[in-house]
Amino acid sequence: NTDIEYRKALCGPTYLGPSTKYFNAYALANAEAIYDGQRSVNPDDRVFLLTRSGFAGQQRYSTATWSGDIGTRWEDMKAQISAGLNFAMSGIPYWTMDIGGFSVENRYMAAKEGSEDLREWRELNNRWYQFGAFCPLFRSHGQYPCREIYNIAPEGSPTYQSMKYYTELRYQLMPYIYSLASKTHFE
């Protein structure tokens, strides 16, 4: 990893001014360009951009941020709580994560039915799913193994039933979520 001050020194001036003042503002300009381009082609369609880069103010371009390709460990799930709070405190109301983590440990990929690793994989995904149901965007995504609930746990199992419950709860919360989204946009 390169020192941040060295990276800033390597950057040339930006359209807005010196790179040291506007470092990382690329995300805002990128979101604006995509938004304006989509609106110019299809002015009556809603634009939605999901990006891993973030900068204050990008929400005005219908942009949501996700925390990137994170690992599949308990500490990775824990880190998403502070990541979400940081997004929100930065004025970015729409954020998400790869529920269950993106980069899966080999022990989970190779787990056999009845193994401790498979039990832990299911528990981790279940807890992450429960947390994700209350986040602004509910998105289960990642590398193999597949993330559909029927691929994580057998139908009828406690893990499956829990994940199904939180999926249904999320849909029950949609009027509330849409109302908050509208309030965020208009107020």
Task: State what each model feature region is.
Residues 1-187:
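Catalytic-domain carbohydrate-binding cleft regions of carbohydrate-active enzymes
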